[in-house]
């Protein structure tokens, strides 16, 4: 599954094919077709594996965060790490773009909707805990607003070909959370 998830992250849904996954994993083609009868099953497994890996990373990060008030920029960085993944230097904008391409492309794959709802619920729970531990608790409605704000900021930055969509999202989220 790691090979499939890596292909998904690197190139989106179009790169996920039984043959490509088998080649990446160094396995014969029959090994992927044995476990996944259809491409949809392979895609769903890759999305779930990647989503769970990201949630595990987020939980590990949260475990390292002491429950204490923190400055606004630290809170914003923690939230963005959960929503956009950790900063990736020169590849950050590209990885953020690929992340949003995957999110939008799931809309054309109805079989992924239940999984995406489940992963989204878990992510929102993680974000609520990040904010609460940081001294900035929010209710469900406010959390949805913050997520929508980040999503909108990132999409607008990507459309404008802004070289740093994370910085745009950081600025807007910071302004929204400022007392």
Model-derived regions, located:
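Solvent-exposed, amphipathic alpha-helical segments
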Residues: 3-11, 57, 61-64, 102, ...
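Hydrophobic alpha-helical connector segments
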Residues: 56-96, 143-146
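Hydrophobic/aromatic-rich alpha-helical bundle segments in the mid-to-C-terminal region
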Residues: 69, 112-117, 132-179
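Amphipathic alpha-helical packing segments from all-alpha helical-bundle domains
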Residues: 55-56, 60, 90-100, 108-134, ...
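Residue cluster at the C-terminal edge of the helix-turn-helix DNA-binding motif
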Residues: 10, 24, 35, 53, ...
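Short, basic, alpha-helical segments at the C-terminal edge of helix-turn-helix-like DNA-binding modules
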Residues: 48-54
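Helix-turn-helix
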Residues: 6-45
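Residues in soluble alpha-helical coiled-coils and helical-bundle/repeat scaffolds
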Residues: 34-41, 66-67, 107, 111, ...
């Amino acid at each position: 599954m790691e090979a499939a998830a890596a292909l998904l992250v690197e190139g989106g849904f179009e790169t996920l094919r039984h043959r490509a996954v088998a080649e990446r994993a160094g396995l014969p083609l029959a090994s992927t077709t044995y476990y996944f009868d259809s491409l949809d099953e392979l895609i769903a497994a890759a999305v779930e594996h990647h989503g769970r890996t990201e949630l595990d990373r987020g939980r590990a990060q949260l475990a390292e965060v002491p429950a204490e008030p923190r400055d606004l920029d630290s809170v914003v960085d923690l939230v963005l790490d959960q929503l956009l993944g950790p900063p990736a230097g020169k590849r950050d904008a590209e990885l953020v773009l690929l992340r949003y391409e995957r999110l939008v492309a799931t809309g054309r794959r109805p079989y992924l909707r239940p999984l995406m709802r489940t992963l989204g619920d878990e992510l929102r729970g993680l974000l609520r805990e990040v904010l609460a531990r940081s001294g900035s608790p929010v209710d469900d409605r406010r959390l949805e607003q913050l997520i929508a704000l980040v999503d909108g900021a990132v999409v607008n930055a990507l459309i404008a070909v802004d070289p740093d969509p994370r910085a745009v999202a950081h600025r807007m989220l910071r302004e929204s959370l400022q007392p």
